[in-house]
Structures are given as C-alpha cells and as structure tokens.
Amino acid sequence: EDTDLLDNYSSYYDYNEKNEAYNPKPELVTRQKELAAVGFEYQYAGEGMGVIKLQADYYATLFVPYVSPEYRDYALIHAAQANEQAVMDGGLMIEYQELGERIAAWEGYLRSYPDSKWQQQVQCRLSRYQFAFLVGLDNSPLFEDGSKKLSQDVAQAWLEFVRRYP
C-alpha cells in the first residue's frame, strides 16, 4: 500500500503559492495519522522519494525511565538529533555549527561509555558527521565556488568547535 506513496512521495504534496509551503494531500494526512498512532512517520528521502521511520523520540519516550544511563543517553541524543535530517541528496540540511554540536555529543557519549553496546552505531554516525564537517559533501562544499577560500559559515563553525571543545 505504501510502495507508490514512498516512490512518489513528493507528489503527495500540493504547493501553496500564497504561503510558499508544501501541504500534504488528504490521503497522506490520513496515512501520517495511522503511522503516528504506532510510533512511525514518513520522511522525505530526496529525489522525490520517502521512507518510513520511527518517530525521533520513540525509544526515549518508552524506555528512558527504565534503562541504564548508557542506553538513556544514547536514546536522548538520538531523539534530539533525529528530528532534523542532517544530510539529504548529497547536501547538508543543518548548519555547520549544528553539525559540530552533533559531533561533540557523540564524542562525549563515547568518552562516557567507551565499551558501549552502541559503539558501532555511534561510531558510524560520528564518522559520517566528521566527514561532512571536515571534508564537505558533493552539494555542500567547504570552499566557496570551487576556490581555495573556506566558506565563512564553515570557518566560523570550525572556530567555534575548537573553542568549545578543545
């Protein structure tokens, strides 16, 4: 039932020129409500397609009061970051400074829990964030217009990161 919707996700939105916003069609709103009732949601994945994913705070809401500090911290960091997709279509969807904050959060987690059961997942996410932060992405280069001049927002994010996390 969701195959067409996921393959053609962007076609389930109408563009409203008056407020310059994309509004979901009634069919999508109905499906969104059904998914939300069981802890899932749709997310735009790029290239007109969508995916179904757990709601960002799903695990945190259910388990945080009942689990170890290691799992609690993992769930809380994940919930805080999963609300806003970091990368899509080879481009950074968040500010470089926010990307630095995400890196610091996961580095702090690994320092606090060096033998974490979640180490592989954390390290994978951390490596992707570090790559985007230090090397850039196809559609979010670090340098201005192919020059050797570092983009102003990247330079500021790097300086702020070094200042806050020496």
Please identify what each model-predicted range represents.
Residues 16, 20-26, 30-31, 58-100, ...:
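Short coil/linker segments at helix-helix boundaries
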Residues 119-124, 148-152:
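Short, charged, amphipathic alpha-helical segments
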Residues 1-48:
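N-terminal Sec/ER secretory leader and immediately downstream segment
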Residues 2-8, 114-119, 123:
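Short, charge-rich amphipathic alpha-helical segments embedded
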Residues 65-69, 109-121, 161-166:
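Short solvent-exposed coil/turn linkers within tandem alpha-helical repeat scaffolds
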